[in-house]
């Protein structure tokens, strides 16, 4: 069967394409730009065209469109005119989950890392899982795979457009719940209501795994049989404390050693009302948020019967997904890291991880805010998001599918940030020049956002490298 995918360059739709290719289907697609995701698909035989035209639909049997594409899109209109079924991600998720054990990872933050960790744990256990991940994952080689149909299918269950409600998972994780996607969910109550519906779709509450550290996640679940996980330093000193009984999976004695994180894992036994040391783990990710992601993955893998050896091997091996604390390079003592963080909570967590790993560095942060709706709806949440940074620079808003005034929205956001050194730096080119000029040896430049703001870091590295080369030439 021939599938044509509109918006194939995105993480979610490229994952759909990989699964369809694994199943033996013909895949074509269209998007506005080429990237590493489309290059990988083209190497596998997908025919991708850049731009959008009715003729691109070709002889497709089915058309699949990203949620960001409206029904009036010219390729969707052409497909309907010709009687070609038009599907969304949710339709395929629903089809693929029939007759298969599904592990769904939902939540506002941490979905990509948690999903990838579970998939890697299953792989290291000798299972060939299927997976759909919303980010490039070098350790797995690809962001989606159909795998063995008899093995679990691990899905990053995106809540955008309520897509995750297409799933009735056997095991589900809710990493955290904080109001997001304000264009779909006009209020926090509507956002939480969608997660409540998702939680109810898990047949057995004992197979629902929830972050006990997050108030939003606890609110939307509320079932006493759900497994909870979290970080509890007191457990190392008093493992018999009744207060710890709320957590089924607990990380204690968390310590950071450069690029490595170590923690002890304690397990609460509900039958005996006691705790036991389950193991000691090391991973190549930093930050408390990544410890929580690891706990969620451990709980899911253990529920699936995966042994500690495979779990530990995957944790020690996993290098992270692209654009998740992604070290881009170092020039003249200046390190550049990029992260997808674009929500205030994600920014705080990423900054905390950066401070833990680079405690002596001056941290220069560039944020490219993402979408006008999110920027204006969350203005009051940004006040202390940058407290751990030394210098804060705010770029023009990346509009994505929206329209508005990028500079005005950036100024509105910057005006809410309680930081002694915050400025608006304009578009990507202007931001690059401004930030490159203030960087000095020993600095860490952290570029944040879900748009193309990563280019600031890449171009800064290039400019710094050229300046360094010129300096060396003049000295000789």
From Swiss-Prot:
- What broad class describes the main subcellular location of this protein? cytoplasm
- Keyword presence, Cell wall biogenesis/degradation: yes
Keyword flag ATP-binding = yes
Q: What class of enzyme is it?
A: ligase
Query: EC number(s) for this protein?
Result: 6.3.2.8
Which keywords does this chain's UniProt record carry? ATP-binding, Cell cycle, Cell division, Cell shape, Cell wall biogenesis/degradation, Cytoplasm, Ligase, Nucleotide-binding, Peptidoglycan synthesis
Q: State where the protein is found.
A: Cytoplasm
Cellular component GO terms, alphabetically? cytoplasm
Q: Which pathway, metabolic or otherwise, does it act in?
A: Cell wall biogenesis; peptidoglycan biosynthesis
Homology family: Belongs to the MurCDEF family.
Q: What is the protein's name according to its record? A: UDP-N-acetylmuramate--L-alanine ligase
Q: Which organism is it from?
A: Roseiflexus castenholzii (strain DSM 13941 / HLO8)
């Amino acid at each position: 069967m021939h599938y044509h995918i509109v918006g194939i360059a995105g993480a979610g739709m490229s994952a759909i394409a990989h699964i369809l290719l694994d199943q033996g289907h013909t895949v074509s697609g269209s998007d506005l730009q080429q990237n590493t995701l489309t290059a990988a698909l083209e190497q596998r035989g997908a025919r991708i065209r850049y731009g959008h035209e009715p003729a691109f639909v070709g002889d497709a049997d089915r058309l699949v469109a990203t949620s960001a594409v409206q029904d009036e899109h010219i390729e969707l209109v052409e497909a309907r005119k010709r009687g070609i079924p038009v599907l969304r991600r949710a339709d395929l998720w629903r089809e693929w989950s029939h007759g298969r054990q599904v592990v769904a990872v939902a939540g506002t933050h941490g979905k990509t890392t948690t999903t990838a960790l579970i998939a890697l744990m299953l792989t290291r256990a000798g299972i060939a899982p299927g997976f759909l991940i919303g980010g490039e994952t070098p350790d797995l080689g690809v962001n989606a795979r159909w795998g063995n149909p008899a093995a679990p299918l691990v899905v990053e269950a995106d809540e955008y457009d309520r897509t995750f409600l297409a799933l009735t998972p056997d095991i589900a994780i809710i990493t955290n719940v904080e109001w997001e996607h304000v264009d779909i969910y006009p209020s926090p109550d509507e956002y939480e209501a969608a997660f409540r519906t998702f939680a109810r779709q898990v047949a057995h509450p004992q197979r629902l795994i929830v972050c006990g550290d997050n108030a939003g996640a606890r609110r939307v679940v509320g079932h006493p049989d759900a497994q909870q996980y979290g970080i509890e330093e007191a457990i190392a000193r008093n493992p018999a404390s009744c207060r710890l009984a709320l957590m089924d999976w607990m990380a204690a004695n968390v310590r950071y050693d450069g690029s490595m994180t170590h923690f002890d894992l304690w397990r609460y036994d509900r039958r005996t009302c006691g705790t036991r040391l389950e193991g000691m783990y090391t991973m190549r990710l930093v930050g408390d948020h990544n410890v929580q992601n690891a706990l969620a993955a451990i709980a899911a893998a253990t529920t699936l019967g995966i042994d500690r050896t495979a779990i530990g091997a995957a944790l020690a091996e996993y290098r992270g997904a692209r654009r998740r604390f992604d070290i881009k390079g170092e020039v003249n003592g200046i390190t550049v890291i990029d992260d997808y963080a674009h929500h205030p909570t994600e920014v705080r967590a990423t900054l905390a991880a950066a401070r833990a790993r680079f405690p002596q560095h001056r941290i220069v942060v560039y944020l490219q805010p993402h979408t006008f709706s999110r920027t204006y709806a969350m203005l009051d949440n940004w006040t202390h998001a940058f407290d751990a940074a030394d210098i804060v620079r705010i770029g023009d808003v990346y509009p994505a599918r929206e329209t508005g005034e990028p500079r005005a929205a950036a100024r509105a956001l910057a005006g809410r940030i309680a930081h002694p050194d915050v400025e608006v730096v304009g578009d990507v080119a202007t931001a690059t020049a401004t930030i490159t000029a203030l960087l000095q040896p020993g600095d860490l430049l952290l570029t944040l956002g879900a748009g193309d703001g990563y280019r600031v870091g890449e171009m800064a590295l290039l400019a710094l490298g050229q300046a360094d080369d010129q300096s060396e030439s003049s000295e000789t």
